[in-house]
A protein has these predicted regions:
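Bacterial N-terminal signal peptides
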Residues: 9-18
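Short alpha-helix capping/helix-loop boundary micro-motifs
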Residues: 174-185, 199
Length: 258
């Protein structure tokens, strides 16, 4: 009971922040509410790769930055639209909602976003608010196969991933450069928006995911942190985090569609 009261207090605090957050949207508040229930849950990597055969894994007790966002989004969509959370999760995580081996999972966030937009789950609000773009040049997975359990001994999977990278590496995407992110946030960024943090690491587009959360007059990051080993709300502002992460270049901002 005490834990539930603490979560409610934190949610209400986040919703009553500085005016820079602007008017909040119901869908965003639902996302934030669901995300806050994960506070303190342990960060565990590779929870989707416990089996040799690809299958839908639902582990709400151990998350990484991506599965944390996926679970919260799936739970929120199930609440507002009806239906099973697992059905939404499969359509969020896999290309066209079909599980067909390791490479059917949406490993690159560029494709994850594209899939979510096509399914009507999310909208990319970055382009409406930022003219800055980055060209898509994806190659990291195929050039680092030993870093992935299902690639290091599978030339077939590496070839499939290369095909995915080639198809995705056209055009560009809009992002908000880190220099334009203030401690107080921006009026068009709302509580519960999904943050996809972009990177200068060759062959990658995004290196971290989380949620926007206004608190104490600052825009913060609610995320599954590998360094803290759990889901946390950043102590400093989101903008401050960029000063300590030299590989972070900016952010794509997504919003759930109710």
């Amino acid at each position: 009971m005490i834990m539930k009261q603490s979560i409610l207090i934190l949610l209400l605090t986040a919703a009553s922040l500085s005016l820079t957050a602007g008017a909040q949207e119901p869908g965003c508040q639902l996302i934030l509410h669901n995300a806050l229930t994960y506070l303190g849950k342990p960060y565990v990597a590779h929870t989707l790769e416990i089996n040799d055969e690809e299958q839908l894994v639902v582990n709400l007790e151990e998350v990484d930055c991506t599965t944390f966002v996926e679970y919260v989004l799936a739970q929120s969509l199930a609440t507002v639209r009806g239906g099973a959370m697992e059905d939404y999760l499969k359509r969020i995580r896999y290309r066209d909602g079909r599980i067909d081996g390791y490479t059917s999972r949406l490993h690159y966030i560029a494709e994850w976003v594209e899939n979510g937009v096509q399914n009507g789950f999310i909208k990319d609000i970055t382009a409406m608010n930022s003219t800055d773009t980055v060209p898509l040049k994806l190659s990291f997975m195929s050039t680092h196969p030993n870093a992935y359990r299902h690639l290091k001994d599978s030339p077939e999977n590496v070839k499939k991933i290369k095909d995915v990278e080639r198809k995705l590496s056209v055009g560009s995407f809009h992002y908000l450069p880190k220099e334009k992110i203030s401690d107080e946030g921006l009026p068009w960024i709302k509580d519960g928006d999904i943050f996809c943090i972009t990177t200068n690491i060759a062959g990658l587009d995004v290196v971290h995911l989380g949620f926007a959360c206004y608190r104490d007059g600052q825009l913060k990051l609610l995320h599954a942190s590998s360094s803290s080993k759990q889901v946390v709300l950043s102590e400093g502002s989101f903008a401050q985090m960029f000063r300590h992460n030299k590989n972070w270049t900016g952010v794509r901002v997504l919003r759930m569609i109710q």
